[in-house]
């Protein structure tokens, strides 16, 4: 069965043009054809045009947290010959993420709370920071004093990819397989994005970048860095992970010239590690917190701030007819 227009190919993205006028308090959102000659973000005659990229990551995270199978997901119905074992990998990763989510929900005793559909992702160890809001209607029906004392909001962290102190963690075989599947799924999603990148050429490409993909890329290279079977990091993922706000037009060009990680850089990573821990000074009496930076491919340092994902109003399908010049067959998905 072919997918209908409301569904999305795995890894596809779209660009929505937001048009605002000075004499309106609201805005009109128009999704333009990616090849249409639309002007860049500008203000002219009281009209401002701004591009918004829907990377599809909110939908991916939502599907995984719900634990849906591939056949139940929004991704079914497309040709995925370029993404090996996608259905198997997706099902294993989805079951793993949903299982970890349920454990966190149960341990925090969040009955009577509803998940706020804004997902925050913590790097480098891929973790969801999820906020829950108390169901006020239930509180009104239940005048119990203990119920009234419960906070209006709660937050839990769902840890999914462990990169540090792994020898101190007792893993079940299911957790090991789930973690591997999640990393493999991230690789597949990035590959799907790259597969669509060439056909989605837009005049807005110089203003859009892959910043929201960074948590996936950092998790991939972080996991590769602790894989004793790998001699070096996969240059594609490492290069993408260390790009700092590179626009899509430069990214598309750069994919043609990605080179192997140098021996010198490989030795630096093995000696000093891929990540550097940073103590963040407290503000307004808060306790000291810990952050991380990623060692760039040129030995630079990139601070890994949390990323936040919200639902985007609309998303178009992409008709894939071309593929970028990078040989995707070189990729080892590890599953």
Swiss-Prot record:
Region (Disordered): 27-48
Biased composition (Low complexity): 27-42
Pfam family, one: Reo_P9
Protein's name in the database: Non-structural protein P9-1
Species this protein is from: Fiji disease virus (isolate Sugarcane) (FDV)
Gene: S9
